[in-house]
Structure formats: C-alpha cells, structure tokens
C-alpha cells in the first residue's frame, strides 16, 4: 500500500507520498502515488527519491517538482485544498463543517476502512454541496450500516442535519442497527412503534434519530400513520433508506409515499444491488452513486472471501412436468403444466425436491467440511422450516451427537 498517508485531520487524508531510493528519478513513483491517491480520494500525490519531490495536484491537474526542503506544510496543503476545491471556487462553510468533523471513535468502535472513509466523505460532501438525493452502493458484508452511522454522526455533530429517519423493511435490520453500529447515539435514538407513539407524540421531540419499519409508518390499509406521527412533512431533514432496491425506488410503491411526504429532506439510498428495471429504478430516483464499492473490490482487497459457483441440476427443476396423479406436499393433485424454478416453494411445494436439495447440500459438505459455516437461503419461513427438517434428516448421524 502507500508508503505515507498524510492527514489534514482524523477524517480527511490529504496527501500520499511514495518513496523511492536515489537510484530512481524524483518522479519515478508518482504514478503509483496517484493510483493510491485516487483509491483514497486524496487530492495531492507526491513521489520522492530523497533528493526532491514531484507533485500531482488533482484539484488543478498540474504537476511540478521542487527541492526536498520545500515540501508544503499541513497548513499550506489545507489552504490549497480549501481554495482550489470545486473547480477553483473553494469550499463552502457547510463543506468545511463536515470536513472538520471527525469520525466517531471509542473503545468499541473500530476506525473506518479506507473505502468506508471514502463512502462517508463522498456522501457528507455531496450533502454539504446541496445534493438532496444520494445513492451509495456497497457490497454485502462491507459495513453499510457502520458507514450509515458515521454519516449520521458527522452530519449531526457538524450541525448540517438535526432530525434523521432511518427506514428498513425488517425488524432484525432495525434492531441490530440500534443495538450495534448506532449504539453511540442510543440516548437520542428511538424505534417507532405506532401503537405506542400515537399516544405520546410530545415525547418524540426529544429524539434525533428515528428508526422505523415501512409497515409501521404506512399502517393497515394504507392508513398513512406517518402523517399522524409527524404532521409536519418538514420534520426530518435526512432520510436514510436501507436496501433501497427492495421497493423505495418503485414509482407506485407505498414506501415511495413516505419519501414523497418527507420530500424536503435529504434522501440517502443504500444498497448492494441498485435495481434498474422498466418499473423500478434506484438511479432515476437517487441519482448516480456518489461512491461504489463492489463485490469485486471487496474480494481483491481481502475484505470479502472469494467464491465459486457450483451449478447443480435437480430432477425437479426448470421445465418440469408432473406425472399423472402426482401430488404436492398438501396431498393435492398437481396441475398438469410446465413448472420452472421460480414456481417452487412459492406457487407449488414438492417435498421430493426439498429432500433432493438438502441431500445435494449434504453431499457437498461431506466432500469438503461438514462443520463449515453454511447459509441456506429459502423462499420464506415455512420453506426454511421444511429445509431445516430435510437437512436434519439428511444428517441424522450428526444430529445424534
């Protein structure tokens, strides 16, 4: 990695220095320094052979060489950054406020990885410039919730935002976020429970960060609970949409109604897989991603495990047709037609297929490591319970222990 990273403050790296020996030219390592600088979102790249320096300024696009004793001080680099940013127009007061605000640190809070720092800095920077719709794409397992927390922390502490709504579609996502990554903000955090909160509206004002399930805000029969809880549509100035590809970007989604109600707020969409279809588009709503850290990036950097795809064909798969009189798991005769993989465990449940899949998984684990951590994705909870039982039966020898 880079030989030296120079920081303007704990949140902002400002320069990369690549060191070579005197047998190389002063600019020999400049391209390497520029590569690292682009990776870390750093604006000044330097190379040195011990006798002088070569500089590439990403803000102006210009390069120069200078003597070893002329290297700019931290204060000089910061002033250049402040004045040269935004195509020479300089940084705004809001940009300075978030740049100077450090990340949340503490005994149980690990420092951000380089790509998390990039994601946070890009996001808060875009918001400081006035961008109201922001898309952040990060591969699963790279710390999206931690990144969201650091974004919220810096925006709140810098004063740019005061009231935050964090939207998700599953309880476990909300509860884990509150209990883990957002724990440093627990005194100002509240999980919305419509049945309780509707009777204590005056107490909501004491919180800054609200977590909510879409279902709690929408209510039964599209009751629009969010209007009762928050009659002022300008109540929130920041809305974060977790896994925004699941529905918030769909034009006719009830979830979109929530976003439209709080339309004056800045909206941040976070996803590992931005959805782009005729009917649903993350990019058309949130805009092009301000930062992307892909699965490929994570594997290359060593933060994610590499994988290989093993395709297995089951006897009951695509273009399967039942035999005459064949019955499903409920004992009902299966309709005589062609079935595809998208039908199974949704439109039709066939126990033989579940057993076959469980056996294939078992065979693979027997050939590798039966004690290896394994995740099996299922259609729903009912399917998951059937698969659990099938796996237990296929591994009865292990279950006896």
Regions found by a protein language model. Name each.
Residues 173, 216, 245-246, 275-276:
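Residues immediately C-terminal
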Residues 371-401:
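Carboxylate/His-rich catalytic cores and anion/metal-binding grooves
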Residues 1-163, 168, 172-188, 205-209, ...:
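ATP-dependent helicase/translocase motor core
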Residues 111-119, 144-147, 346-358, 383:
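Phosphate/oxyanion-binding active-site loops and adjacent basic polyanion-contact surfaces
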Residues 280-372, 388:
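Interdomain helical connector at the RecA1-RecA2 junction of SF1/SF2 helicase-like NTPases
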Residues 229-268:
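SF2 helicase catalytic motif II
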Residues 196-210:
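Conserved motor-coupling elements within RecA-like helicase/translocase cores
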Residues 172-196, 390-399:
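Conserved helix-turn-beta segment of the N-terminal RecA-like "Helicase ATP-binding" lobe
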């Amino acid at each position: 990695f880079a030989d030296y990273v120079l920081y303007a403050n704990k949140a902002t790296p400002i320069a990369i220095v690549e060191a070579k020996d005197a047998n190389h030219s002063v600019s020999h390592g400049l391209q390497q320094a520029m590569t690292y600088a682009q990776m870390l979102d750093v604006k000044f790249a330097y190379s040195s052979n011990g006798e002088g320096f070569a500089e590439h300024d990403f803000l102006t696009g210009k390069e120069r060489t200078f003597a070893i004793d002329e290297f700019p001080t931290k204060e000089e680099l910061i002033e250049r950054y402040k004045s040269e940013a935004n195509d020479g127009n300089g940084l705004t007061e809001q940009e300075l406020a978030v740049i100077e605000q450090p990340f949340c640190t503490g005994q149980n809070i690990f420092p951000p990885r380089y790509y998390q720092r990039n994601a946070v800095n890009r996001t808060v920077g875009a918001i400081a410039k006035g961008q109201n719709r922001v898309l952040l794409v990060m591969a699963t397992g790279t710390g999206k919730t931690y990144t969201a927390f650091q974004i919220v922390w810096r925006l709140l502490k810098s004063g740019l935002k005061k009231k935050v709504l964090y939207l998700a579609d599953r309880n476990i996502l909300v509860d884990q976020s509150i209990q883990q990554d957002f724990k440093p903000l627990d005194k100002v955090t509240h999980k919305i429970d419509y049945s309780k909160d509707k009777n204590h509206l005056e107490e909501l004002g004491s919180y800054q960060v609200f977590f909510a399930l879409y279902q709690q805000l929408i209510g039964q029969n599209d009751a629009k609970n969010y209007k009762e809880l928050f009659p002022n549509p300008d109540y929130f100035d920041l809305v974060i949409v977790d896994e925004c590809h699941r529905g918030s970007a769909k034009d006719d989604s009830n979830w979109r109604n929530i976003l439209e109600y709080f339309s004056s707020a800045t909206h941040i969409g976070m996803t590992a897989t931005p959805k782009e279809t005729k009917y649903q588009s993350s990019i058309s709503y949130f805009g092009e991603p301000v930062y992307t850290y892909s699965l490929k990036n994570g594997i290359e950097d060593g933060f994610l495990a590499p994988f290989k795809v093993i395709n297995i064909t089951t006897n009951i798969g695509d273009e399967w047709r039942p035999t005459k009189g064949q019955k499903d798991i409920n004992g009902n005769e299966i309709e005589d037609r062609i079935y595809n993989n998208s039908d199974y465990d949704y439109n039709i449940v066939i126990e033989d297929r579940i057993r076959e899949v469980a056996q294939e998984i078992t065979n693979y684990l027997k050939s590798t490591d039966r004690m290896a951590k394994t995740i099996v994705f299922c259609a729903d909870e009912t399917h998951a319970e059937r698969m659990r039982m099938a796996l237990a039966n296929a591994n009865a020898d292990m279950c006896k222990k």
